[in-house]
Regions:
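P-loop NTPase motor module signature
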Residues: 1-436, 512, 571
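Second RecA-like catalytic domain
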Residues: 247, 252, 297, 305, ...
Length: 665
């Protein structure tokens, strides 16, 4: 028996779920909702011996929640309480509570839309509004209405900061609020932050001051990304050494770290009297109690993936956090004792922040969502009930890409999933990479395809060092040495590649009639996943992509001299005209005549030449916006002349046309 603030509302929650199918629980950080709610509901009669699934937004929170509950039951993880996440599952036939990452639930719903052996799904930290969580909630509600009329699936949505009014309207659920027992946190605002301000300098100065003012405290610092964490850590290390400050451990905490390294950041310091500074992304906002922390330093920034519909690319944007996120971060200082939160912005700027973060469904690439829904037989996303429905533009763009990848076709009954598309759904990866894996199997190069897919499914530690995908593959194959600092990446990537290989071997895939030469394989496979990013060299280091964008390779890498590239990863600013190529491989242009020939189009182009005052016509072979060849036509198609004149007038006006004075008047 353990007493935490949420204990006070558990009986009320049980009573509501006895007579209703949904409930919303709003409780502050540290109230105990993640640990106690599943345990309290596990023996309710209405559960009928079925399982409880609890979704967590991150892997470290998934494992930590399962471990805490198992500890309370004095059992190992995998007995009554277990967890499921990619590449790591600990459950047994005795498991009644499964803590899972959000993507796992969507795959479970594809295999069994009714979730027949599940009695309750708990959405924890739902305020984060990830695409997977929104999709899973919509599919749970749809599956319940279709398949669980007599034994409805129950749903509990939990968070500390939540727009509960929208959820009430959507689900009709009763809202329960636990006041909790948050220790008081003193908030200290800084001067107004400016875009040109150095995050590194302000954060280092604030951290050093906090170490001096609170000599017994450990500190949690929120930074937008891995790069900032590395730079702040380097600066702090130098300053601590210069000032002869001992007994302070610097611990990074971000998603790309191994689970063991993440666990090291939240664990106690090695010796009494020592302390730590945890440099974290927003991974530390929710579901974690970091031992010893009662001081928070918040930069007020986060890095989020944003899909750019004009280019079809997803970029990481550094943005100001919402008021809800700032509350979550502040709460980290009051989990164990009274604390203090230093906000590196002014009080007036706090009032200008958005109340809640933008849901991912409104800014994400919808291709994975579209493929999932089409597998369910849903042609129109509006057939589901959403908190925020996906936009029609991004939806149509996602459908267009799936058509290009051969996943769907347009039939008499609307959009239909092809056999190829059904195989793509079964692979737990973005549809682009699923298509590439199947293509790799068809040409007899499954291993290379699995390595590329695993490299692109994780954060790339070599982005600053080399743009050549083959150099990464050589490291994984043991042809080149792996730097010591990337050994964790090496293990994770191999493990993921083996997982992809096991999945792809379960599929029956026809062998391709055209097979590439070994030196063509990497470029071809990347082109399968990213046909819109095939690039042709136009000047030293500069390339034009098939989607019309410009891109360049930084530094002096030999790939700069290549005539054709297949680009896997790209970066840049949304409004800039050019992007930076992060990883790519040489593409053999003879593939346009063989394996890529089905994507080459033949177009007749007619234009008015203002210099010679006549029509010119040519036939172009194109791959997207890239012209492969052009042949002049001796005869100009009559039906194209009018359009050519209109286009010329729209850009140049009437003056260049050879009109007589009488006609001009």
């Amino acid at each position: 028996e353990i007493k935490l603030p949420v204990t006070e509302i558990l009986e009320e929650l049980k009573l509501i779920l006895k007579g209703h199918h949904e409930a919303i629980l709003q409780a502050p950080p540290g109230a105990g909702k993640t640990t106690l709610v599943p345990l309290a509901l596990a023996r309710e009669p209405w559960l009928k011996h079925k399982k409880i699934l609890m979704l967590e937004p991150r892997r470290i929170a998934t494992r930590a929640a399962a471990q805490r509950m198992a500890d309370l039951l004095q059992e190992p993880v995998g007995q009554t309480v277990g967890y499921r996440m990619r590449l790591d599952t600990r459950v047994s036939s005795n498991t009644k509570i499964e803590v899972i990452t959000e993507g796992i639930l969507t795959r479970m719903l594809q295999e069994d839309p009714s979730l027949d052996d599940v009695g309750l799904v708990i959405f924890d930290e739902f305020h984060e509004r990830s695409l997977d969580a929104d999709l899973a909630l919509a599919l749970c509600m749809k599956g319940r209405s279709l398949f669980r009329e007599n034994d409805p699936l129950k749903i509990v949505i939990m968070s500390a900061t939540l727009d509960s009014h929208k959820l009430e309207e959507l689900t009709g659920a009763t809202v329960i609020r636990s006041e909790g027992k948050q220790y008081p946190v003193d908030i200290v605002y800084g001067k107004a932050s400016e875009p040109r301000d150095s995050i590194n300098d302000r954060t280092v100065a604030a951290t050093l001051q906090a170490l001096a003012d609170h000599p017994k405290s450990s500190i949690l610092v929120f930074l937008p990304g891995q790069g900032e964490i590395r730079r702040v850590a380097d600066s702090l290390m130098t300053e601590l050494h210069h000032r002869k400050i001992d007994g302070v451990h610097l611990r990074p905490l971000y998603g790309n770290l191994s689970l063991e390294a993440q666990q090291g950041a939240i664990a106690p310091v090695p010796k009494p009297g020592e302390r730590k500074v945890v440099l974290a992304t927003n991974i530390a906002e929710t579901s974690l109690t970091i031992d010893g922390v009662d001081i928070v330093i918040d930069t007020g920034l986060a890095r989020e993936p944003v899909f750019d519909p004009t280019t079809g690319m997803t970029r990481l944007h550094t943005r100001k956090i919402s008021q809800a996120s700032s509350t979550q971060r502040m709460g980290r200082a009051g989990r164990l004792r009274p604390g203090r939160c230093y906000r590196l912005w002014s009080k007036s700027q706090q009032g200008q922040m958005a109340p809640h973060a933008t849901p991912e469904i409104l800014s994400a690439d919808l291709t994975p969502l579209a493929l999932q829904l089409l597998q369910w037989g849903i042609n129109d996303p509006m057939e589901l009930t959403w908190l925020d429905p996906p936009g029609s533009g991004p939806w149509l763009q996602a459908v267009s890409l799936l058509v290009r990848l051969g996943a769907i076709v347009t039939g008499s009954n609307g959009l239909q999933l092809t056999d190829h598309g059904a195989q793509m759904v079964g692979l737990a990866v973005h549809p682009r990479l699923a298509h590439m894996l199947i293509c790799g199997q068809s040409i007899g190069h499954t291993k290379t395809a699995c390595l590329i897919a695993s490299i692109l499914s994780d954060r790339d530690p070599f982005g600053r060092d080399t743009p050549d995908m083959n150099e990464r593959i050589d490291i994984l194959l043991g042809k080149s040495a792996c730097p010591n600092q990337h050994r964790g990446w090496f293990r994770r990537t191999h493990q993921l590649a083996e997982n992809f290989s096991a999945q792809i071997k379960q599929l029956v895939i026809a062998t391709a009639t055209n097979l590439p030469e070994p030196y063509q394989v990497t470029g071809y496979l990347i082109a399968c996943a990213y046909p819109d990013r095939i690039a042709r060299r136009r000047h030293a280091g500069g390339f034009q992509l098939a989607n019309g964008r410009g891109a360049s390779i930084p530094g002096n890498h030999t790939l700069k001299q290549s005539r054709w590239l297949s680009v896997a990863e790209i970066g840049g600013l949304a409004r800039s005209k050019g992007d930076m190529i992060r990883s790519a491989a040489i593409l053999d242009e003879t593939l346009f005549e063989s394996l890529l020939a089905d994507q080459v189009t033949t177009n007749t182009i007619v234009e008015w030449d203002g210099r010679t005052n006549r029509f010119i016509a040519e036939e172009r072979q194109q791959f997207g916006d890239l012209i492969l060849s052009r042949n002049k036509l001796s005869k100009v198609p009559a039906d194209a002349k009018g359009k050519a004149l209109i286009k010329h007038v729209q850009t140049a006006g009437l003056d260049p046309l050879p009109f007589t004075p009488e006609i001009r008047q």
